[in-house]
């Protein structure tokens, strides 16, 4: 329950503010809510108000339990219950308040302009038409699921990079590899719950949770270019590490020590053919290898003095997974399933989908040639086939058996939006997950000069995360991103959750010699994540005016910006994904003009065609001219 106040004097004493003794505030949304009212035996009458609206209590007999529908009285945000006039004096009335749940709704219900979403759809679809793999999106506002959509195929390319023609379409049920969004909705959620329950303390030391080996087994590694204070000092540093340090990404661990890679040079922090990885734990993903990985983390010396810098490290959240398992005595996946997923009815949220009832085509595929970056990378045991239904992240798959705090979770946009909505309310239905104090502690700026970080959570701050959350998001907007192309955004001011999932790395590597981590999918507007929030807020902020002129002007400006990027790319052919993404913006402009039947949009479109190169883009120019309908 969100609260179980016993009136009067629900705080347990008579407060001299007087009014407080009879009022209790809860978080709710308009159009939903139920109170469970239980008058004590002997009560002959009492008053009940919700947001100053009186509820008829005449039929609520003493000693009974009464479910009261308050959906007609609730508002979005803070709601107030008032209970008083209890007779005879000295008797009590208990009121139990549940948490809001996510219910079906529409964009119109919550004041989001449909045209803004149509513009977004035109951009994503045009990108998909020009080579972007797939995307999926869900929006929850004011406790209502108001938008779901999906674009593209579950697996868009063959291993040789040619388009795959026999792949099924993505649906709203398709599971995506969430990559680092896993961090928030597994390790952070688990710790927020455990701290709320009093079962964990953020200032608990890791050595006390995991045993003395966390410190004593540390070995000496000379990291190139780092302080390297010596083994004795390094052990002293590790001995004082707390959960809070880990959550801040300021614990001192290297970003990516690759415990699974037998030829990874820990001093150089890169793969060196013929090198021996002194922290190698295994690559088969077995339970034994997962246990060995914990021992490898124990051996890992810190790279810098804790608290002196922020280094985003997957090791931090691998370690948190083990800490949570030590606190709960359960596997991380089992704990999350029984605590969150099952009570919330989340049937498409899981680790290791192929081991939990899902088929490969239930999942959006990621890399085309295993973890090889199209043949640029090799290590013992590396996967070479297209990854689908298995976690892409190497450390999670090879070293952690697919179950970790840093990666491994799969879900779809709709279920993840429901899960993320808990950060707006603290619970779901009759399930209390996080206290307000705990949510505030985890989402507040971790330091005065680091407003873009909470404890694990990414924060908008002063436009410091606008590439992800847009420029209109308030400073306390939180969320995360994932390397596979995933975004979650939670805006507590607007009671808004946006989940946008892509599998942008389900595409060829653009130039594996220049950068084996840059996939074709990275070049498209649909991969930039923040454009979603930017357009959505446009649809929230029209203030009763017709926003279409602004949308049309913005679309041409986006085209100009895209072709400025094309120009920066130098002499690139028409087949390059950067150029294809430019074509996609122009095709979105054509689709927009066709939908609005506006001569202004036609003029914007024709003006944008001058951005094309007469020679390189001749074929596309002819195609675009045919796309514009006559009206």
Model-derived features with residue positions:
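Catalytic loop of the DD-peptidase/beta-lactamase superfamily, centered on the K-T-G motif
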Residues: 72, 86-153, 165, 308, ...
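Short active-site loop at a secondary-structure junction
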Residues: 65, 130-138, 157-246, 303-316, ...
């Amino acid at each position: 329950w969100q609260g179980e106040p016993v009136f009067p004097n629900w705080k347990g004493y008579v407060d001299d503010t007087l009014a407080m003794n009879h009022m209790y505030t809860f978080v709710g949304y308009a159009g939903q809510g139920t109170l469970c009212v239980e008058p004590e035996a002997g009560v002959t009458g009492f008053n009940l108000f919700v947001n100053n609206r009186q509820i008829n209590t005449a039929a609520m007999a003493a000693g009974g339990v009464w479910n009261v529908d308050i959906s007609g009285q609730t508002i979005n945000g803070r709601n107030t219950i008032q209970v008083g006039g209890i007779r005879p004096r000295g008797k009590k009335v208990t009121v139990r308040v549940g948490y809001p749940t996510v219910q079906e709704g529409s964009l119109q219900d919550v004041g989001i302009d449909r045209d803004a979403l149509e513009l977004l759809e035109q951009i994503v679809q045009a990108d998909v038409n020009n080579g972007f793999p797939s995307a999926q999106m869900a929006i929850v506002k004011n406790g209502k699921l108001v938008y779901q959509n999906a674009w593209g195929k579950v697996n868009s390319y063959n291993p040789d990079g040619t388009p795959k023609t026999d792949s099924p379409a993505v649906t709203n049920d398709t599971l995506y590899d969430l990559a680092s969004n896993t961090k928030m909705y597994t390790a952070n959620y688990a710790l927020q719950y455990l701290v709320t329950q009093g079962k964990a303390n953020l200032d608990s030391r890791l050595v006390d949770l995991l045993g003395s080996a966390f410190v004593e087994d540390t070995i000496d590694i000379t990291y190139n270019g780092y302080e390297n204070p010596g083994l004795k000092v390094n052990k002293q540093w590790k001995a004082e590490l707390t959960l809070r340090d880990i959550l801040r990404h300021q614990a001192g661990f290297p970003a990516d020590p690759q415990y699974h890679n037998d030829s990874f040079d820990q001093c150089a922090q890169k793969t060196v053919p013929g090198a021996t990885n002194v922290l190698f734990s295994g690559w088969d993903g077995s339970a034994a290898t997962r246990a060995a990985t914990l021992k490898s983390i124990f051996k890992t010396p810190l790279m810098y003095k804790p608290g002196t810098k922020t280094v985003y490290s997957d090791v931090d959240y691998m370690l948190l997974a083990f800490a949570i398992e030590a606190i709960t005595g359960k596997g991380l996946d089992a704990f999350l399933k029984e605590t969150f997923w099952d009570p919330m009815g989340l049937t498409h949220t899981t680790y290791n989908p192929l081991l939990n009832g899902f088929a490969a085509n239930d999942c959006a595929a990621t890399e085309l040639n295993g973890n090889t970056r199209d043949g640029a990378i090799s290590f013992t045991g590396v996967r070479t086939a297209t990854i689908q239904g298995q976690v892409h992240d190497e450390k999670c798959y090879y070293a952690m058996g697919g179950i970790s705090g840093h990666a491994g979770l799969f879900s779809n946009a709709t279920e993840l939006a429901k899960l993320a909505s808990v950060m707006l309310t603290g619970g779901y239905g009759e399930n209390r997950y996080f206290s307000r104090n705990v949510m505030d502690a985890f989402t507040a700026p971790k330091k005065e000069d680091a407003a873009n970080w909470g404890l694990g959570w990414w924060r908008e701050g002063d436009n410091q995360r606008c590439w992800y959350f847009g420029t209109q998001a308030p400073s306390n907007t939180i969320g995360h991103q994932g390397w596979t192309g995933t975004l979650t955004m939670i805006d507590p001011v607007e009671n808004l959750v946006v989940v946008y999932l892509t599998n942008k790395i389900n595409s060829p590597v653009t130039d594996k010699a220049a950068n084996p981590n840059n996939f074709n999918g990275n070049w498209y507007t649909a991969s930039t994540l923040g454009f979603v929030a930017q357009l959505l807020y446009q649809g929230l902020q029209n203030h009763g005016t017709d926003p279409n002129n602004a949308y049309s002007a913005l679309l041409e400006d986006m085209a100009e910006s895209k072709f400025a990027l094309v120009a920066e790319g130098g002499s690139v052919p028409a087949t390059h994904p950067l150029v294809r993404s430019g074509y996609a913006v122009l095709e979105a402009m054509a689709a927009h003009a066709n939908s609005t039947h506006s001569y202004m949009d036609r003029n914007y479109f024709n003006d944008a065609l001058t951005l094309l190169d007469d020679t390189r883009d001749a074929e596309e120019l002819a195609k675009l001219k045919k796309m514009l309908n006559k009206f």
